[in-house]
């Protein structure tokens, strides 16, 4: 009896100690203020459910740090972002990405590797696809993306981008648009590698919560198919311009414009730029609209209520096109969101946004809810 009492007491103390440890860990991640340049780590649990996946569970993390803690050097925040989830129907999503700034910001490196075994809805190609044509497609995708840029003069970086990819697709209904659509090239998927130059102009005051300054990032990928897709050659051009204006101590106005184009004679559908994400054109399903060219712009007003809490409102427009863009076919989006700053020294936040898009005749208005780490741009 004494042994049982001692064992029960030991287990109770252990559980209490564990609970206190978890509470301290959560408090440190989300609520403690740290004015030093120490590293920090935060975790976001993932629990969702959908008919095509069943229950999905997982988590995302953000480890942030400085490669140089000497204040006078103004070295920017670096981070590592892991993401993993699995579903009860056997699908999975794994990725790790990093954004690294060397001491004094002389070099900037990024790297990302991901594997996705996950279904998505394919609506066809073009700027006027219909929800009724949605085709459920299973995708297996591997991607590796790398970049390296060196500071060559004040605020100007020059470097390269490189990477590899492989896509595989499986479509159950043989009569769906994914199989029957005449515009769809390489519907079985394919692999490839790429390399190309990049140029970045960046004078932002902060890379995690910018209050003033601008960044212009341009790159071109020279792409070559491999294995069964060995005959493919092409290119991909992208440019993004973002600028921030400090209206007062708590109010920031941000502008963001992106353009992407697939070049070359072929148009593998999985390489086509697509409209809609948690960062640009919030409110649209990613891939609802896709084509050889994509353009979009947005403006976001950010109000910092306190050190911890912020709110935003955003409005934008964008479209995809096979050739030239047209102002008359731009699709609108607007919405708002909440920010919680878990690391006030580094300006790191958790964001929750609700975006609203176009109302297509005969369909419900398009919309989306997003939770993520960091700012949208």
Please tell me what each predicted stretch does:
Residues 196-197, 335-342, 365-377:
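Outer-membrane beta-barrel "beta-signal"
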Residues 33-41, 48-191, 275, 287-288, ...:
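Gram-negative/organellar outer-membrane beta-barrel architecture
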Residues 41-43, 78-82, 108-111, 158-160, ...:
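Transmembrane beta-strands of outer-membrane beta-barrel proteins
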Residues 1-23:
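Bacterial Sec-dependent N-terminal signal peptides
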Residues 70, 118-124, 167-173, 206-208, ...:
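Outer-membrane beta-barrel proteins
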Residues 22, 26-39, 67-77, 103-108, ...:
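Short loop/turn motifs that connect adjacent beta-strands in outer-membrane beta-barrel proteins
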Residues 44, 60, 97-99, 147, ...:
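Outer-membrane beta-barrel architecture
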Residues 206-305, 311-314, 321:
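C-terminal outer-membrane beta-barrel translocator/porin domains of Gram-negative envelope proteins
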């Amino acid at each position: 009896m004494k042994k049982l009492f001692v064992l029960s007491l030991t287990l109770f103390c252990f559980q209490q100690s564990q609970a206190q440890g978890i509470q301290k860990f959560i408090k440190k991640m989300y609520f403690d203020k740290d004015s030093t340049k120490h590293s920090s780590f935060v975790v976001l649990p993932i629990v969702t459910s959908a008919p095509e996946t069943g229950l999905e569970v997982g988590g995302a993390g953000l480890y942030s740090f400085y490669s140089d803690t000497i204040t006078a050097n103004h070295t920017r925040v670096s981070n590592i972002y892991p993401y993993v989830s699995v579903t009860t129907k056997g699908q999975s999503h794994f990725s790790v990405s990093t954004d690294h700034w060397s001491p004094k910001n002389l070099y900037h490196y990024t790297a990302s590797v991901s594997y996705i075994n996950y279904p998505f809805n394919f609506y066809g190609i073009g700027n006027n696809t219909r929800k009724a044509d949605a085709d459920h497609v299973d995708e297996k995708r591997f991607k590796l993306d790398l970049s390296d840029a060196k500071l060559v003069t004040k605020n100007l970086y020059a470097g390269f981008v490189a990477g590899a990819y492989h896509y595989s697709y499986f479509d159950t209904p043989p009569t769906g648009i994914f199989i029957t659509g005449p515009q769809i090239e390489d519907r079985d998927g394919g692999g490839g590698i790429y390399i190309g130059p990049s140029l970045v102009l960046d004078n932002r005051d902060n890379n995690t919560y910018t209050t003033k300054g601008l960044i212009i990032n341009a790159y071109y990928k020279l792409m070559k198919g491999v294995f069964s897709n060995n005959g493919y050659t092409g290119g991909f051009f992208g440019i993004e311009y973002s600028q921030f204006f400090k209206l007062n101590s708590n109010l920031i106005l941000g502008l963001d414009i992106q353009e992407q184009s697939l070049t070359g004679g072929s148009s593998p559908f999985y390489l086509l730029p697509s409209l809609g994400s948690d960062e640009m054109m919030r409110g649209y399903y990613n891939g609802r609209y896709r084509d050889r060219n994509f353009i979009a712009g947005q403006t976001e007003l950010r109000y910092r209520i306190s050190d911890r809490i912020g709110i935003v409102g955003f409005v934008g427009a964008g479209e995809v096109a096979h050739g030239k863009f047209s102002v008359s076919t731009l699709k609108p989006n607007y919405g708002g969101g909440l920010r919680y700053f878990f690391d006030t020294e580094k300006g790191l936040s958790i964001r929750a946004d609700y975006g609203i898009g176009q109302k297509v005749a005969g369909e419900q208005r398009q919309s989306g809810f997003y939770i993520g780490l960091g700012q949208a741009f």
